[in-house]
Amino acid sequence: MFYAHFVLSKRGPLAKIWLAAHWDKKLTKAHVFECNLESSVESIISPKVKMALRTSGHLLLGVVRIYHRKAKYLLADCNEAFIKIKMAFRPGVVDLPEDNREAAYNAITLPEEFHDFDQPLPDLDDIDVAQQFTLNQSRVEEITMREEVGNISLMTDNDFGDFGMDDREMMREENAFGDIIHESSAANLLLEAEPGPAHLPDKTPNLDYDDFGDNNLENSDGGILMDKILSNEDGGGIFDDPPAITDSVMMPQDHGDDDDDFDNFSPAGGPDSPDSGPVEPLPNTTDQTDQTEQTTLVPNEDEAFALEPIDITVKETKAKRKRKLIVDSLKELDSKTIRAQLSDYSDIVTTLDLAPPTKKLMMWKETGGVEKLFSLPAQPLWNGRLLKMFTRCLTPLVPDELRKRRKGGEADSLEDFLKELENPEVPREEVLGHRSDVIDQTIMEEPSMLQASSMEGSRTALDESMMPPPSRQRGLKRKSLETLEKDAVLPPMGVLEQTLQPLDQSVLSHQLEMPQVELPPEDTTNLSRLIPELDLLDEKSKDKDKDDSDEEGEEGQGGDQDQEERRWNKRTQQMLHGLQRVVAKTGAQSISLLELCRNNNKKQAAAKFYSFLVLKKQQAIDLTQTEPYSDIIAAPGPRFHIV
């Protein structure tokens, strides 16, 4: 946007308009009142730079919002003024007449009331002043601190602790010390001669130098105590380190009756005895004093300051965690990735799954699978216990041989065993070896078992050689079921003889070129009888392949023809022809499915049972069952001979 700075600048003419259009809550009442809509509209109509239509529309929206806010604020002010006017001119307030519009002076002026202060005072005797004062009077012991004066020598004071908090500190401000402090020195006082006996003071306790009075300080040269404390000469100030006491310094005798010299600070004052003579002058102790001033009371300075260390509690500060800046390594997608994403449409494409057109086909689709046919009964069982009883016998049992093979490691997995049991390949020789079925027993002029075995062996070889490989697994299962039905029910010999005549010569020549099956020598006479059977089987195999291809083509067309319309297939026709021959030859009115499926495997029995159901649906036979899981009896139906 080349006009972004013009529109979005904070001091631009359209800044508040743009803000009102996109962030209305950001505008305050002052911003709304300060905004000039006339200049803003003119700026929008004739902008300095060209703006897009969308931008001008946004700005017009901001103008409308600001105008709405202004109208709302004006309405609020009008309502407030109206309410105030209405409250001021209430119906209960009566207007004053024209001659009484000015209020009276007394009504608006406060009265001046001067109180009489010349009242007689009460008598002094009426108030017990002494009693009032004694209430707040305390004893001296309660309000006065005790003066604890001990024999503390200032010579040993190390200047630590409190000092100068008594009356001696107050004497610094007295004028009596003005001349004495500067004139006197410690050397002059110490070397001054002791006065004679005539000038000795009396034995009465005097307070001349007790630092509690200044009566005699004006005429004296100053006390030794005050000169020693307050003098800065000779290093004897109160703020200097006191000199150490050595043996060379002469100290006066301690008199027990001298109560005034409680500090025992200096050798000032002569002895009280009258016979005391003049004292010899003291030797020059300047060198000794300088030496003592440089010494300390503790011989080892390191030991004097060898204090125990104090535990330093360091306040733990929380370390500031450094923020880690996360930067995406891949900032943009390359063209290959974008092109691959655009070409990937797997998430929006699914397989087409159309529902069956009729409800019956929908029901067959739900329950017609192998997992439903082999686990559910023919009629719905709502009781769970009965359903468990039905499915209890449907679990495949693994034979001992397969178990031994499984333990020996010859098989891959148990699933392979179960698949072999559920979908075994149909052994044609085994089927023909057990020809003791009811249908086979009713066929007239049936050859011997040896001839049947030779015929079946040749037919198996031809079927395996001429059968094209199935394209799908579904076609393979259908073909295997049809071959089972074909092997289980053989057409009568009369039908074989009738179909022998119109055989094509090309088919016969093609079959003669096929490899011959080894037969026993005693069955060579029946070889001519095997050829028509082989030809018939060849035709049947071709027809079967053609039917299968037609069925697959119809399935590939999307199920245009309903499965119900294709009623007859080869298996049901063979089953119906077999039942018709049995009824015609034996005269039996019922056929047992259990006897028909004897010595058959699961797949063969299922194929026969399915054929029975198809025939029952077309009313060719009637099925009866006395109780669940019992034998099914088939009897000729109303359309048994019509179909």
UniProtKB/Swiss-Prot annotation:
InterPro entries, A to Z: NXP1_M-like, Rad21/Rec8-like, Rad21/Rec8_C_eu, Rad21_Rec8_N, ScpA-like_C, WH_DNA-bd_sf
Source organism, top-level taxon: Eukaryota
Residue ranges of the region described as Disordered: 234-298, 447-479, 532-566
Site residues, Cleavage: 275-276
BP-aspect Gene Ontology terms: apoptotic process; atrioventricular valve morphogenesis; blood circulation; cell division; chromosome segregation; embryonic viscerocranium morphogenesis; enteric nervous system development; heart development
GO MF term list: chromatin binding; sequence-specific DNA binding
Compositionally biased intervals (Low complexity): 266-278, 285-296
GO CC entries: chromosome, centromeric region; cohesin complex; cytosol; nuclear matrix; spindle pole
DNA repair as UniProt keyword: yes
Amino acid composition bias (Basic and acidic residues), ranges on this chain: 537-547
Entry keywords, A to Z: Activator, Apoptosis, Cell cycle, Cell division, Centromere, Chromosome, Chromosome partition, Cytoplasm, Cytoskeleton, Developmental protein, DNA damage, DNA repair, Mitosis, Nucleus, Phosphoprotein, Repressor, Transcription, Transcription regulation
Similarity-based family: Belongs to the rad21 family.
Subunit annotation: Component of the cohesin complex, which consists of an SMC1 and SMC3 heterodimer core and 2 non-Smc subunits RAD21 and STAG1/SA1, STAG2/SA2 or STAG3/SA3.
Protein name per its UniProtKB record: Double-strand-break repair protein rad21 homolog A
Species this protein is from: Danio rerio
Lineage of the species this protein comes from: Eukaryota, Metazoa, Chordata, Craniata, Vertebrata
